[in-house]
């Protein structure tokens, strides 16, 4: 486990040697020697892992190595900080820089020599403790792209959630959901121990076509052990999709009772389905039920819980359904579907070994799929190694195999994937994790290395998808064939928290207690109120990351003058001070909730963060002042509503730019944005005299663009047949996967052009107008998976029988109700049509 940290630090030394070309020779030589020694120590750590040495001596030695690796990182980051602070000085003070740099070099040489003495002591103790048999680090020397290619070969194709052994349960519960004679609000409780598949069964019901057709209003929310009723109510309101973004920001400030009244009003008189996943206390249901009308529309509520008393403790009409363990035959079927993906020939010995291990899983689906994910990447001969490892740890039948399987699966991960898994411990229980945000955080932390073939974000996505493929992480939402959000099962989250604690990796604070508290921990995370955290007044100068997931609160007690090594700041809903003191040279990620900005001098602060990679400002805030990003040449993602002007320089690595005004976009130099993948251009002015101009020529350089959104509250006339548009769109259409157009009035039918885009998977036309007929030919939209046409006006829409062969989601709504629709019946079955 410690090997993940040491390999990360070894990589950091290597990167530092490359980046600091002007480094003094003495510093360079000492660092190279230190890197060699730490690489060697890393090999012995791998040996400790491989031999499964868990004696106190090995643990003590591993702890020495862990502390040493962290101290190496501190020395490097502090030295880099001093160099950057000197490089920013101007005027006469520059004359002293040369002397200062030499003094800094002498200082780090002294620090490194102390570290070298320590590593010699660590080596002597290794020999004394008898830790030998050097094992080379796995994947050493491979480039990121090569490791990803190896992962890609081992990955399965996109797999829908497999539900084995629950077919009868699903049939019974579906009948309860669709019972037309039951007009009252009816509650279905699914209960059983963790890992049995309660959430999987509930999701199967929630996503079934019959349920979608029956319930126009559906919502899903998680509860968990540490819940706030107001948060749960807000999640239900958001999930229903009945409330505008502007309205959502208003009701975020409501008290709990006001939210109850608001949600009740939304659902009154409607046939709804609400899934409340993972309830631990009856009080949680008592807090929610007042907001869910007991109407006579045939509404339903599904509850999942581990506790029988909670399942049967709901009032009103209900049905409690207990999930059972899988039979051996069902267990083997589930295992076979996942474990044999890369094995062509299954001999008798292999089958026997597999069945012995599956038997030990005792019918627990989560244990079975994690075991299958572990074995699916191994050769038949390696199956015996896993089996032997299980037997060594299972001293008697009273020990459950699940924790052992989870631990083995973690140990088999590459160090990058281990760091990704550990990082999942920062998120609250049952939290739906936005995958793009997770990727941006992992890159900002320095855990991911790219190369000339692959961007760091692509590498990070593959490591996360490896966790999904191994069933260590669950995909929740997909778009365009990609995972967009994920969730970690609470049993696996417990594993991540336990290992993070052992590695001094994360401090997590909640209302009750810090799950792990240390003044030298790298990351500090607050899940609920900030007051408890700030009241302890700890000073952790080694902190690299601070993240806040709690409710609205004031930021007090964080002294940024002493936190100069910070790489990640995600303030969440904290009310920010007027300014942040200190030069945060190492900062790579800054996340801000718009409701918390107030007098925060966002423009002045952002412009100083020269090495920032990701700037995220939540979409509930419109930045109307000009933001100067010209010195921020490392930017990769700029996310927010920047309508006051955005000054951008040479940012070749910029991949995300959402959203800026049309005027700001037209002033940029798109030829510098060669890696831009996601672009959002929006106009906020509602003036009818205001004419918005789309410069199509500005898009011709964006050959990497995948997602394009153009939005305006005023009517913008758009032609896709002008010479400029045709020339520009011919370039970007080759890469586009998603197009969203809002408030556009088309001068001609856009479909003949849009349907030819070879990679287009999502098309959304919202509040658009076209006075004519839209036609989709038989060969049109070959890869399209989602089509939303929410038009203000449209005379006619015709889709030929063979068009859109891959469509799985369809919604058509036209305010002008006399629209003529000619749509194949097979497509009508995929969605909702209101015309």
Swiss-Prot record:
GO terms for cellular component: cytoplasm. Keywords: ATP-binding, Coiled coil, Hypersensitive response, Nucleotide-binding, Plant defense, Repeat. Changing residue 659 to F: In strain: cv. RLD. The keyword Cell membrane does not apply. Changing residue 286 to E: In strain: cv. Nd-1 and cv. RLD. PANTHER family: DISEASE RESISTANCE PROTEIN RP (PTHR23155), DISEASE RESISTANCE PROTEIN RPP13-RELATED (PTHR23155:SF1193). In cv. Nd-1, it confers resistance to Mask-9, Aswa1, Edco1, Emco5 and Goco5 loci from Hyaloperonospora parasitica. In cv. Columbia, it confers resistance to Wela3 locus from Hyaloperonospora parasitica. In cv. RLD, it confers resistance to all of these loci. This is Disease resistance protein RPP13. It comes from Arabidopsis thaliana.
